[in-house]
């Protein structure tokens, strides 16, 4: 019966959205569920998919040349939804004809009216959230009009159910850029959750106990994380060390060889995510010199469009202490014995990965949910420090260097490392056989099979 149970995944086509969904898919496949993941053709053709238990199908997201790229987020996602819905109907019929009818569609929460779309296609629907429960609660309260983002002038703190008191700088930052209605779209993630059959969050019960309970009082949410490869956690899935889905090629050999030559706990790993940073030239310069002035060895991921912001003087001085790469295998790096801290933008995936591997953090949040995650890193889980921002919105190199030193040495560093190791143990506990997330996944499968 289980082998006939078929789940189709529809990720949003970005590395930070596809990776956790792939981890969930791999775990379900290992437990005997048939899995198909639907990807844009342009992405599937250029990516590395490394799991033989995962079937793939393609959807084209090409926009008509005459129409161009829709200007508003609602218009853009409306076009995407139309293309997905039209193609999914054919894919579902194909799977049914092949003897593997789809029982459930797991759809990234960013897609509009996901549950409605699934039910119109005659299939159960489950939104998949790639941010924390805390951020979900904040976005939902903003969606209800109980909170404005960006906050009103004069607002210094915000009190919300299940959430610790938030300062103005702890709230999500929405840089609208191309899509001026982006925040409205983020709020609309909650528009049809009351109709969802399941709702998945990449978190675990002990990490966000109160936040998950509050969301559970609103909708049928299920905590299924931390979603990172099994060999870094519970080791139930044999040889599961890779993301399984990668948009970028990392020079694994040179990164690990460089780290192998360094003393245990002596290296700062710095990375600010898989999309273009919002750093101006001044900001980039302060981060760069802050790393150098900390006097610690560092490995820094600087994606290609950003590398031009690094001065020739910095690059020359960094040769002795630093390795600057365009991409690296983050999990392998974070788990390496030489890593002592992680300077991060506080994206949710990076936060969960560092916490699960017991690495304390230097928080440099930029936008979206990142300030909220930084608040939890520093004040709730107590596994990092946050670099203060100057009046002009730019960090100062001296503050960057001092924060690195706080995490890497002394009593503060010892306390942060101890807390990080505690959370690492709890992350493993959640995913090992009989752990909270493992049980949640098993109960979900059982209910799906019997429905």
Swiss-Prot record:
Induction: Induced by methyl jasmonate (MeJA) in roots and leaves. Induced by A.niger mycelium-derived elicitor, thus improving ginsenosides production in adventitious roots culture. Expressed at higher levels in roots than in leaves. Keywords: Isoprene biosynthesis, Transferase. The active site is at 17 (proton acceptor), 108 (charge relay). CDD domains: GT1_Gtf-like. SUPFAM superfamilies: UDP-Glycosyltransferase/glycogen phosphorylase. It comes from the Eukaryota. Disulfide bonds: none annotated. It is an enzyme of class 2 (transferase). An anthocyanidin binds at residue 17. One of its GO terms (molecular function) is quercetin 7-O-glucosyltransferase activity. Pathway: Secondary metabolite biosynthesis; terpenoid biosynthesis. Its EC number is 2.4.1.364. It catalyses: (20S)-ginsenoside C-K + UDP-alpha-D-glucose = (20S)-ginsenoside F2 + UDP + H(+); (20S)-protopanaxadiol + UDP-alpha-D-glucose = (20S)-ginsenoside Rh2 + UDP + H(+). Component of the dammarane-type triterpene saponins (e.g. PPD-type ginsenosides or panaxosides) biosynthetic pathway. Glycosyltransferase that catalyzes the biosynthesis of ginsenoside Rh2 from protopanaxadiol (PPD) and the conversion of compound K to ginsenoside F2. Belongs to the UDP-glycosyltransferase family. This is UDP-glucosyltransferase 74AE2. It comes from Panax ginseng (Korean ginseng). The lineage of its organism: Eukaryota, Viridiplantae, Streptophyta, Embryophyta, Tracheophyta.
């Amino acid at each position: 019966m289980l082998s006939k149970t078929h789940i189709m995944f529809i990720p949003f086509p970005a590395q930070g959205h596809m990776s956790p969904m792939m981890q969930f898919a791999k775990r379900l496949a290992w437990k005997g569920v048939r899995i198909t993941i639907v990807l844009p053709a342009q992405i599937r053709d250029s990516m590395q998919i490394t799991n033989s238990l995962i079937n793939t199908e393609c959807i084209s997201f090409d926009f008509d040349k005459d129409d161009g790229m829709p200007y508003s987020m609602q218009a853009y996602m409306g076009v995407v939804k139309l293309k997905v819905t039209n193609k999914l109907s054919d894919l579902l019929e194909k799977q049914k004809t092949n003897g593997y009818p789809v029982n459930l569609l797991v759809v990234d929460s960013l897609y509009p009216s996901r549950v409605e779309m699934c039910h119109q296609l005659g299939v159960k629907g489950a939104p998949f959230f790639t941010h924390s429960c805390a951020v979900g609660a904040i976005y939902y309260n903003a969606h209800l009009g109980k909170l404005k983002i960006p906050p009103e002038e004069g607002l210094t703190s915000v009190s919300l159910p299940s959430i610790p008191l938030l300062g103005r700088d702890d709230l999500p930052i929405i840089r609208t850029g191309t899509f001026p209605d982006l925040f409205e779209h983020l709020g609309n993630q909650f528009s049809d959750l009351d109709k969802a059959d399941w709702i998945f969050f990449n978190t675990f019960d002990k990490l966000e106990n109160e936040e998950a309970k509050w969301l559970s009082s609103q909708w049928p949410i299920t905590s299924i994380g931390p979603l990172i490869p099994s060999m870094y956690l519970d080791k139930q899935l044999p040889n599961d060390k890779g993301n399984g889905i990668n948009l970028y090629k990392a020079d694994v050999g040179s990164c690990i060889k460089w780290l192998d030559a360094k003393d245990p706990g002596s290296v700062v790993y710095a990375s600010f995510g898989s999309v273009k940073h919002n750093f101006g030239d001044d900001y980039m310069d302060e981060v760069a010199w802050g790393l150098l002035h900390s006097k610690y060895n560092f490995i820094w991921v600087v994606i290609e469009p950003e590398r031009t912001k690094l001065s020739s003087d910095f690059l020359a001085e960094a040769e002795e202490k630093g390795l600057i790469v365009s991409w690296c295998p983050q999990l392998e790096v974070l788990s390496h014995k030489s890593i002592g801290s992680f300077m991060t933008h506080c994206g949710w995936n990076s936060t969960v990965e560092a916490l699960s591997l017991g690495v304390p953090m230097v928080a440099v949040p930029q936008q979206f949910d990142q300030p909220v995650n930084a608040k939890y890193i520093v004040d709730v889980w107590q596994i990092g420090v946050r670099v203060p921002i100057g009046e002009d919105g730019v960090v100062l190199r001296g503050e960057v260097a001092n924060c690195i030193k706080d995490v890497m040495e002394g009593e503060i560093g010892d306390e942060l490392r101890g807390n990080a190791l505690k959370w690492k143990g709890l992350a493993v506990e959640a995913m090992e056989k009989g752990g909270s997330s493992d049980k949640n996944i098993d109960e979900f499968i059982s209910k799906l099979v019997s429905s």
